[in-house]
Amino acid sequence: MDTDSTHVRLSAIGIVAVSLFLALFMRLWFLQGIDRQAFEAASVSNRVRVIHEEGPRGRILDRNGKILVDSETSIVVSLDREPLRKMEEPERNAVFVSLADTLQQLGVPTKLSLIEKRYADLRYAPQEYVPIADDVDPSVEIYLMERADRYPGIIVERKAIRSYPYGNLAAHLLGYVGEINEKELVERGGQLPGSENSSTTAPTTTAPTTTAPSTSPGSSSGADSGTRLTDYRLGDSIGKGGVERSYEADLRAVPGERTIEVNAKGDLVDVLSLKSPVVGDDIWLTIDIDLQAHAERLLAAKIQDLRGGRDKDNNRLNAPQGSVVIEDPQNGQILAMASYPDYDPSVTVNGISQEQWEAFNDPNSGLPLVNWALQGTYAPGSTFKLYTALAGYNSGYLRDGTEVVNDPGVYTIENCKGEKCEVRNAGSTPHGTVNMASALTVSSDVYFYKLADKFWNLTDQYGETPIQDAAAQFGLGAKTGVPLSGENPGRLPTPASRKAAFEARPDLFMTGDWRSGDNINTSIGQGDVLATPLQIVNSYATFANGGTRYQPQIVTKVTRPNDLTLPANDPANYKLIRQVEPVVQGTIQIQPDQYAKIYDGLLGVTQSALGTASASWQASKTAWPMAGKTGTAQVSKKADTSLFAAWGPAGTGEPARYAISVVVPESGFGGEVAAPLAFRIMEPLSFGTLLPACLSADQSACAAAADAASAASGNDVTSGSAD
């Protein structure tokens, strides 16, 4: 019995032992065979990295090839979190403390909390380098490289950043770049860290460029653009505004890729493969930087001079912002676009601090990031009379423009019942007998009041919107199509839009009805009418060329450089990728004799002794006559908005070469502020005596020379007529 029991127990032990050995054998066979590839892949993943390399963005040039935005090398200190994660927390913290202290001593203000925050930042993929200090001095790079063993997990590399040779000039037009955010990344087909489609093989790291970029002069634009638009990583730069944003697909470099082998500490062992980035294409703007600098300088000086003054009604002249736009009437090219206040785009290069961002968006600072030339909307005042004049002819109410009106300075609205049945000229000034031409020259509101009143009382004959229809032909009430983000369409009110607005928000309107008073206000650019300075200049450029409305353009061509060390404007040094051709948006039909009547009236604004801008033009005469219209728009409880729109040459038989609009809110009469400023800007342009724009390094001396030249010309006057 005992023998049998012992035998059974030994048999059981044997079976268990064999089972254990069999399980161990099967596990070894599985590890060496079936799962070998997975372990090999994991091993490769731990020692091989594919590094995503951004290349230098393309340059932005003015129409003559002067470099306005370039790329330069910046030294960046970053964290390599892979080796840092393998450390014990006390050891890792010691590295962070030492690094923060060292950077502080080397003149790079860096808080320990920033390093800790960046280390834990989930926006970056696990293997991505995380920047903690940008644009450091080369001495910092040397110091850290010589002591690499004391700073494990800390790398120093180089990347391309934007530089601005002309400083703040054209900042609103050029725009700025910033780090791509998650929304932008997803929109462009990029992948967020940890997403399902992220690679599970060799990790991809975003790193600064360390190799010379290829210009690939023979590659096609189409082949490059797909890569440029989709191969983004968090940490990459992207255009955030202006030309940088609108032409991102051209400016962005085709990213490169570097496959490297590292050891357990993260140190470089070998470069396994290298694909250099392809530098972005160059964008040639339509603007002339010399003219841009001239316009910006005079605009800023005028606004600063106005502030703190008082108008005739004792309203404070705050002049919170202003803009100047100059356009070529023959093709729609924008030659200058000045917006004040401006900003320094270089502060955005390494990211905008919260403090700086709040300052940019503080209304008390004038909102310097806003491009007031295309985002600001203002009542156009009497500059709107051009469209009302055209409506008079288009409707058939006016035949040849010789019809006269007696202007006693006040007009009584027909069929009006109530207290507010009288409307007046500025200052109730009487102008006597006026026709179309003279009404424009002296800015007779009464003439246009009567025209608008007749339209509304005879809607069965002229319809409800003859004035709005004429203004729409000039592009008001719609975006111009300029290839810049953020453009405001303005507002062109109609009886239908008033009714819809009332139904949507009855608390904001007394009634949804459109009345004669609304028509009258609209006829002189008041009431609910709003326009941008860009819309105004484009409409006057349209009239100046005879009626062809062009889409405003800001780019002439896109090129690919052969050699970045050679002059950018040498045709032998670049390949043309595409030329930007003029785009016709519409044509205004008007009889030659009717066109001539309006033309003569606008020419008289500057050339007639009675013109509202004649005194200003006499003080700052251009090489040829100019025609245009002053505007003074009333704003409740504020000083008036000053406007002027004009073109030249005018009245000489030559094609118009330049159209200009000037808008300065809360500054006073158009004939006293905007018109004199416009002539001062146009004077050296017309004579060919524009001074070269100052490079950023020469700003002080160059600006002093420009001020001296301006003072020598003796044209610092602001006198003029009321409107």
Task: State where each predicted segment sits.
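Membrane-proximal periplasmic segments of bacterial cell-envelope enzymes
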Residues: 1-277, 301-308, 312-323, 329, ...
